[in-house]
Amino acid sequence: MRHIAAADTGDDEGEGLLVRRIKNGTVIDHIDGGEALNVIRILGISGTTNEALSIATNVPSKHMGSTKDIVKISNRELSKEEVDRIALISPNATINIIRHFKVCEKQGVEIPTVIEGSVRCPNPGCITRTNEPIRTRFAVLPDGKGLRCLYCDSVITKDLTSYII
């Protein structure tokens, strides 16, 4: 088992949070501190799923220079669309695919230039908000800190997680 240090618990003994290894599944590491619950939400994971889930929040990280969150999901590998959604809210995240207790794939997320079907347009008059069978399409702004609807040009720069489907 590997120990993952918890955020300062006031424990001078140096004991941290013990998170069990997973046999198969995905570990999402280097999530921006405080974003783990948003990651869980955008992946559609709720208390009614059968996936074993471990969450560590505000873990000190030398790599990130502050704190990070970690999410472990047993028996599930993420789709490219799910990884793209994570990149929108935590561009430093790392995705580790675990098989038989070993990391067999490790990749950093990349913010896509265009994202389809994963974000709801804030404009109630946008064609994607009608009953037309049209998937949303957003261009990621050059600074990576917002999205522009490719149908109506509405821009989202604040509270992006509330628009992720």
Swiss-Prot record:
GO BP terms, alphabetized: 'de novo' pyrimidine nucleobase biosynthetic process; pyrimidine nucleotide biosynthetic process
GO annotation, cellular component aspect: aspartate carbamoyltransferase complex
Keyword terms of this UniProt record: Metal-binding, Pyrimidine biosynthesis, Zinc
Alphabetical list of InterPro entries matching this protein: Asp_carbamoyltransf_reg_N, Asp_carbamoylTrfase_reg, Asp_carbamoyltrfase_reg_C, Asp_carbatrfase_reg_C_sf, Asp_carbatrfase_reg_N_sf
One Pfam family cited in the UniProt record for this chain: PyrI_C
UniProt remark on cofactor binding: Binds 1 zinc ion per subunit.
Annotated family: Belongs to the PyrI family.
Oligomer and partners: Contains catalytic and regulatory chains.
Alphabetized PANTHER family for the sequence: ASPARTATE CARBAMOYLTRANSFERASE REGULATORY CHAIN
Known function: Involved in allosteric regulation of aspartate carbamoyltransferase.
Name recorded for this polypeptide: Aspartate carbamoyltransferase regulatory chain
Provenance organism: Methanoregula boonei (strain DSM 21154 / JCM 14090 / 6A8)
